[in-house]
Amino acid sequence: MLKAPRFWYQPRSLLGGILSPFSFLYQIIVRIRRGLYAVGLKKISKFPVPIVIVGNITVGGSGKTPFVIWLANELKNRGFRPGVVSRGYGGKANRFLQTVTENSDPLQVGDEAVLLMKKIDCPMVVCRDRGAAVKHLLRNFQCDVVIGDDGLQHYSLGRDLEIALLDDRHLGNGRCLPAGPLREPKSRLNTVDFVVPKQLRPNEIYQLKNPAKKIDFNELKELTVHAVAGIGNPGYFFKQLETLGANVIAHPFRDHYFYRSEDFNFDDDHLIILTEKDAIKCKQFDDERLFCFSVDAVVPDQFQNDFFRLISNIILRKQAQREGI
């Protein structure tokens, strides 16, 4: 079981100070790498449709998966033809290109990819080379906008809009790896098009063995439950259950962990509540104690208005460029 170091989220700490020189070196490497793309010394793949990148500058969960689900479905509802590309973290397919289906194996394409595909109505491709994934989407599906899931630092993929998500821990101590949780300096947020705070709304709790069997949120009050989470920010999940009144016995696992039946060998009959990402990998277990806690992203109205105005304008501009207008 792994979790982010506590000192990452403390303003001052001895270990953070000791690691600061390495953090400074890391920042230099990140800036040089990004600069090589900016001046054209490294190739950037460009495409005839808008590429929307959703990501973050911190290590760990920032609510990307629920947000991408919302964005893909909202684009579809508004008449667009979206597609999604991802690296397929946690699976083997990041070494080769693969189209994701509802029946894809999380071991092959990653747990997040399977969860996304079960909740969106658009094509999705996973591959380490996101540019190749976009080309495959455009060759085989009539997409007019592509969402890049967790590709903020994947500079070889050209982009038209960048959305950075921030979770409840914000930027931690404000330092880059390894002294802090930042993948890039915090000044990177000044260059993205949108910064959206993570906000998740509880949807439902259902039994894995029989999804028709649900638990009302009111039933959680004063109920002792095992909360199991192999996600980037398990503390957020535990806090959600506690806010609903549950007495939580927390079991954090490393992100993208693949469970075994013995992981649930607790010495009691308390319910075991999993995140959606974890539940995807536990449906084979014949255990009536296993329940899934599903959530939805809550997205600010102002962002929605600004984003859809921009994406419509970008599509029109790219169409005009293709037609030589």
Curated annotation (Swiss-Prot):
ATP binds at residues 58-65. InterPro entries: LpxK, P-loop_NTPase. Keywords: ATP-binding, Kinase, Lipid A biosynthesis, Lipid biosynthesis, Lipid metabolism, Nucleotide-binding, Transferase. The keyword Ribonucleoprotein does not apply. One of its GO terms (cellular component) is plasma membrane. The keyword Endoplasmic reticulum does not apply. HAMAP family: LpxK. PANTHER family: TETRAACYLDISACCHARIDE 4'-KINASE, TETRAACYLDISACCHARIDE 4'-KINASE, MITOCHONDRIAL-RELATED. This is Tetraacyldisaccharide 4'-kinase. It comes from Coxiella burnetii (strain CbuK_Q154).
